Each structure stands twice: as structure tokens, then as C-alpha cells.
Design a protein with these regions (language model features):
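Charged helix-capping and loop-helix junction motifs
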Residues: 60-67, 110, 141-150, 175-184
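C-terminal helical cap(s) of enzyme catalytic domains, especially alpha/beta-barrels
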Residues: 112-119, 186, 206-242
């Protein structure tokens, strides 16, 4: 799992919001470039940037600040906020942005998302921001009645590879991510899920890793010193290394079984209840498909 430190831009400065309310915007750093350099020095490989003014206005407002960051750090940067047409997508990607995030457009103009994905593939991500499970748009100022899982499934059908999922109630609260919401989403689609909102501790990082998510975004907790970015990145690396070693040990054990027999015993359970349904046997091909 990757950790993406966040920079939210308003009037060219780094700010943080509380529960998505623009009236609560608080400047946490004057210089996006210096902030990005700090993230890079702490081991970040990716960074998440949002043009808050652009998200609200429907067109880029802080692109120059974003380009200054790109010119001064060697990071993969994903950018969202006010990206509503192919011209803007191409504008960002041509300047070196690694991934652009389509938010309101995913809700209102899926044909545009389809076109962008067809042309740029994995360089396109979709941001799904929700209140009480319903998708919000226009910088969180407008609420729809579309369920976040429903929208995610539509995006999966289009071919979207990455979804950034934000529980708006969690934004800026530093009281932990919505694990239930994220787990449900991760189980519902095959897209790579990036968690956003409420991430504030190493325990949160471990919990998100355990869900099998692709990434986690952290902002306010880093600025306030509650989450040590370097420690979070190292923790993910260590957990991943341990999981890899465990997986290798399991693979070795399974290989020993298959050397003795073409079939291995398997306990079949109901996923939702855990009820044991039967004892069966599976071959190597069946095992691979079930993992």
C-alpha cells in the first residue's frame, strides 16, 4: 500500500478543510513547493494534490502552483479539482502529472470519463466523495442521491483502474477513516482503491492495509505532527515485506501438497456469515482462480 501525502490548494496556498466545508479552510503552509520537498525528503514517492478553487468553480484555478511543484520535486503526482474536459486532462498530463482525478465529471459526464480512460488508461482516476453514502460534487457543495457503490460500479464498467474514495464527514477530523465504507467498496469492485479522510495514525495505516487497499491519503495529520510520514511509509514497507514472506511460505507448503496429490482439501464457507458449507477438494487451477 502506498502513502500519498496531500496538498489541497486554495489561492495558491496549502490549506485543510474540516468535513469539506470551505468556510473552515485553514492555511497550513504558505509554499506548496517547500511542502512537497519536505514530503519527498521523508520518503514519499507519490503525492495527492487538489485544486479546491478549481473543484468549486469547475475549471483549474491553481494549475501554476501545481506546475511549480512538478518542476521542483521528483515525485509522482496525482491532481484533481476542476478537471471537466479533455483539454484540461491533456494540459496536466503533458506537463508531467502522473494521474488526473475526475470527480464531478464521473457523476455528470460518464462519456467524458470513458473517452479519457480510452485515451489515457491508468493515468485516469476517479474521485468518489460521499456524505452518508451519497456522492457529492462541485467541491463537495452539491449532494446527489447516487450511491457511492453504484457510481463505482459504473466506473469499473467504463474501465477505470483507480478510485479515490473520501468520506467527507471524516475529512480533517483526524478520528480515523471509515473502514466499513472502504471495505464495502473494495469488495464491490476490482478497481484499486485509495482511502481519503480521517487517516491520522499508524494504526489507521495498518487497518487500511489489512483491507487490501491500494493506497491511503493523509493530510492534516501530517501537518499537525500526529502522523509521521516517514514512519507510515516504512510501516507499509515492513508489513508488505512480512506478508510477502508469509505468502512465500504458504506457496511452498501448497507446492509440497501438490507434489503428493493433484488435489488438496478445501473448506467451503459462506462469505457473509462464515458458515461452513462443505469439505471439498480442489486442483491447482481452482486454487489459483479462488485467490
Amino acid at each position: 500500500m502506498i502513502i500519498l501525502p496531500a496538498i489541497d490548494l486554495q489561492n495558491g496556498k496549502c490549506v485543510r478543510l474540516f468535513q469539506g466545508d470551505y468556510a473552515t479552510a485553514k492555511v497550513v503552509a504558505e509554499s506548496p513547493v517547500e511542502t512537497a520537498k519536505q514530503f519527498e525528503s521523508q520518503g514519499a514517492c507519490w503525492m495527492h494534490m487538489v485544486d479546491l478553487d478549481g473543484a468549486k468553480d469547475g475549471k483549474p484555478r491553481n494549475s501554476e502552483a501545481i506546475f511549480q511543484v512538478l518542476d521542483n520535486v521528483d515525485l509522482h503526482i496525482e491532481v484533481g479539482g476542476g478537471i471537466r474536459d479533455m483539454e484540461t486532462v491533456e494540459h496536466y498530463l503533458s506537463r508531467g502529472v502522473s494521474r488526473v482525478i475526475l470527480g464531478s465529471a464521473a457523476l455528470r459526464d460518464p462519456a467524458f470519463v470513458r473517452e479519457a480512460v480510452k485515451k489515457y488508461g491508468k493515468k485516469i482516476a476517479v474521485g468518489i466523495d460521499a456524505l452518508d453514502g451519497k456522492v457529492a460534487a462541485d467541491g463537495w457543495t452539491e449532494q446527489s442521491q447516487v450511491d457511492y457503490i453504484e457510481l463505482a460500479k459504473r466506473m469499473e464498467e467504463i474501465g477505470v483502474h483507480y478510485i479515490i474514495c473520501t468520506d467527507i464527514y471524516k475529512v480533517g477530523t483526524m478520528n480515523g477513516p471509515n473502514l466499513v465504507m472502504l471495505d464495502k467498496l473494495n469488495r464491490s469492485v476490482s478497481c484499486n482503491i485509495i482511502a481519503s479522510g480521517g487517516v491520522s495514525s499508524l494504526l489507521d495505516i495498518v487497518n487500511l492495509y489489512d483491507l487490501g487497499l491500494y493506497g491511503a491519503i493523509a493530510g492534516k495529520s501530517i501537518y499537525q505532527g500526529a502522523l509521521d510520514l516517514r514512519a507510515a511509509i516504512i510501516a507499509c514497507q515492513k508489513i508488505s515485506s512480512k506478508a510477502s514472506k508469509n505468502r512465500t511460505a504458504v506457496d511452498d507448503e501448497l507446492e509440497r501438497y501438490f507434489r503428493k496429490s493433484d488435489l488438496i482439501p478445501a473448506i467451503i464457507q459462506e462469505e457473509s456469515t462464515g458458515e461452513v458449507l462443505m469439505l471439498a477438494y480442489m486442483n491447482r487451477e481452482s486454487l489459483v482462480k479462488s485467490m
